[in-house]
């Protein structure tokens, strides 16, 4: 559950970076390089989670998990599977929600480039548009990172309050 929240921040950063052509900036030669936006969001999210007491709540959840899953008893797969699927779907939904402003700006940018290219076919619109989308992506990250992290920590706190989503 909690790990999926971190993955949702990474995914949101990846979607945002790919939407704004910033996915390879400072990319490493590792197996799965995460864009710089993803690193920024994950580090900010982890710092925010620690300030909100994630470490205490995680220890509390581990202790209370023995009430739900007693030692030497297997969990029923027919109840765990739907919960896991809901968590994965919710994490991806949260990631897209967090990165939606970047995707919207990307669509507007591409439509604008298409109109400009249609109006002036001899103009190299990529040379004009690339700095614009790069600057817009960085400016959007500057403005939206606090809001993104606030929405994320609220969702994490809600999950930590009731991890199984019951009434």
Can you describe what each PLM-predicted range is?
Residues 1-167:
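Hydrophobic alpha-helical segments and their helix-loop boundaries in membrane
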């Amino acid at each position: 559950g909690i790990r999926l929240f971190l993955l949702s921040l990474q995914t949101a950063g990846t979607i945002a970076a790919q939407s704004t052509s910033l996915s390879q900036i400072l990319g490493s030669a590792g197996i799965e390089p995460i864009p710089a936006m993803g690193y920024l969001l994950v580090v900010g999210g982890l710092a925010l989670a620690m300030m909100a007491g994630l470490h205490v709540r995680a220890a509390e959840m581990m202790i209370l998990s023995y009430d739900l899953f007693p030692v030497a008893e297997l969990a029923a797969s027919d109840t765990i599977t739907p919960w896991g699927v809901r968590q994965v779907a919710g994490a991806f939904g949260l990631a897209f929600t967090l990165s939606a402003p970047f995707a919207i700006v990307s669509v507007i940018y591409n439509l604008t480039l298409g109109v400009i290219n249609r109006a002036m076919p001899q103009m190299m619109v990529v040379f004009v548009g690339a700095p614009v989308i790069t600057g817009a992506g960085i400016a959007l990250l500057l403005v939206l990172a606090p809001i993104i992290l606030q929405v994320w920590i609220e969702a994490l706190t809600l999950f930590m309050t009731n991890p199984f989503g019951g009434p």
